[in-house]
């Protein structure tokens, strides 16, 4: 086995810390049914089945099989007869359960579900192609995926750096980054992929190489930033992208790439709806309300990265562009000119890890509490200490800086 393949396998199986629970170490956050249905519907609507005698479907991290079940269920009956389904996962129990689930529901469909590491598979195929004059790589017409979400702190800095080298990535690497690049290598020309990921790559420095790859190795069709919808139990802010396969690398561009975002609107009342994902079809700037009392602002526009292939992604609409122009005219300076800027804590961490009353909680003050700068501290040149005790926030932060990067506290 080559070193790249060994690396991919060890990264996906890594349990670096003895106290890290298996789902977190493996990144196995399974997909809610409504999100699986949403992604499957988008794939089927975008796919062109007319010229294909056989249709190969792939889930590279099959988990419990929910995504494949949703996708096959959405296919027209005449198409299902032409379908051959493939799924990989490093968890043997998950593979067995998914196989039983799918074969019972779709007895006429051929399933090839294997305990296999997808990254290892792609690297091996890539190395084999170097030794032959003609590519023997298996391509897939439809890919649906929710890749493992494992942060650098859990993978370990050394393995993350090796993954980056193997897949041509730069900076900090989360495990879903190489998954995205690997999907582009097995998606057939004119094939369709629908992928669920964290939305971190859209705005972080470490996501620069992934943003470029998405704009060069796919034909990106639509991006959904699902913001603080809290669709997952894990503290992950999800996103979905829909893309078409290409025959060769493209010049990076964002022309006509649709972009939808949904974020909670604290003070707005909106039209009532029972399904949070159904709100994604709302018009730009509409507010929708769901039964749990939350209200969401939906933005519909196009992807804007400022003309930079590695630039931060945002939704561009006529109203938002006018607002940004106004902000620009009244801007004294930007934070990046003053000091190094890091991404802040996601809103899903509020109330659980961020408090102003750590000294009063049962069991005493945790030893890993650190002071946190919030908007209440912000002022010109130097942060302030808020007058109100309730605004003096501290965060339970279980990581530390080391010579090789950030690491979890053991």
Residue ranges and their predicted role:
Residues 74-84:
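Conserved S-adenosyl-L-methionine
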Residues 312-410:
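Polyanion-binding catalytic cores of nucleic-acid enzymes and NTP/SAM-utilizing transferases
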Residues 53-61:
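Conserved class I S-adenosyl-L-methionine
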Residues 1-47:
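S-adenosyl-L-methionine
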Residues 98-109:
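Short, conserved SAM-binding/catalytic segment
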């Amino acid at each position: 086995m080559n070193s790249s393949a060994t690396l991919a396998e060890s990264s996906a199986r890594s349990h670096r810390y003895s106290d890290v629970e298996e789902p977190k170490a493996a990144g196995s956050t399974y997909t809610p049914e409504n999100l699986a249905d949403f992604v499957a519907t988008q794939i089927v609507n975008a796919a062109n089945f007319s010229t294909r005698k056989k249709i190969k479907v792939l889930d590279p991290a099959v988990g419990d099989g929910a995504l494949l079940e949703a996708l096959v269920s959405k296919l027209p009956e005449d198409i299902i007869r032409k379908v051959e389904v493939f799924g990989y996962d490093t968890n043997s129990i998950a593979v067995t359960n998914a196989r039983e689930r799918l074969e019972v529901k779709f007895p006429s469909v051929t399933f090839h579900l294997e305990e296999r590491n997808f990254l290892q598979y792609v690297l091996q195929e890539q190395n084999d192609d170097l030794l032959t004059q003609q590519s023997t790589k298996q391509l897939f017409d439809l890919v649906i995926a929710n890749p493992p979400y494992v942060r650098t702190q859990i993978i370990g800095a050394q393995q993350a750096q090796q993954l980056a080298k193997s897949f041509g990535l730069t900076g900090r690497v989360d495990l879903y980054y190489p998954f995205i690049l690997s999907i582009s290598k097995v998606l057939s020309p004119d094939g369709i992929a629908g992928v669920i990921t964290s939305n971190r790559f859209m705005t972080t420095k470490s996501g620069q190489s992934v943003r470029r790859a998405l704009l060069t190795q796919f034909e990106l069709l639509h991006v959904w930033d699902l913001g603080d919808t809290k669709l997952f139990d894990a503290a992950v802010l999800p996103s979905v992208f829909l893309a078409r396969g290409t025959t060769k690398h493209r010049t990076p561009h964002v022309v006509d790439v649709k972009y939808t975002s949904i974020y909670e609107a604290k003070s707005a009342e909106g039209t009532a709806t029972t399904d949070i994902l159904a709100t994604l079809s709302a018009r730009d700037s509409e507010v929708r309300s769901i039964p749990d009392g939350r209200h969401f602002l939906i933005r519909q526009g196009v992807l804007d990265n400022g003309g930079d292939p590695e630039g931060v992604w945002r939704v561009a609409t006529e109203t938002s562009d006018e607002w940004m122009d106004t902000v620009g005219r009244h801007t004294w300076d930007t934070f990046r000119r003053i000091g190094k800027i890091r991404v802040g804590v996601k809103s899903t961490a509020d109330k659980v890890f961020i408090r102003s009353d750590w000294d009063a909680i049962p069991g005493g003050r945790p030893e890993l509490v650190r002071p946190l700068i919030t908007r209440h501290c912000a002022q010109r040149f130097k942060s302030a200490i808020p007058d109100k005790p309730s605004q003096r926030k501290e965060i339970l932060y279980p990581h530390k800086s080391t010579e090789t990067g950030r690491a979890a506290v053991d």
